[in-house]
Amino acid sequence: MNKLELDRLDAILNELSEFNEDVRSFYMCNDSLNMHNTICDMRTELISALEIVNDAENRMGH
């Protein structure tokens, strides 16, 4: 793996780590507004991770 691939992998892992924290927060939520905000955060982090994966696949010609 080259430096760029490692950086992308690190970015994906960071997004998934934040997603995991949001999942934990989601189960601790006690009102619907917090639940909604947490779900929005989870969605944003997954989309970011998927965009990084998609970009990497496009660069590799897949």
Features from the language model and the residues they span:
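Short, charge/polar-rich alpha-helical segments
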Residues: 1-13
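Short, charge-rich amphipathic interface segments used for partner binding and complex assembly
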Residues: 11, 15-62
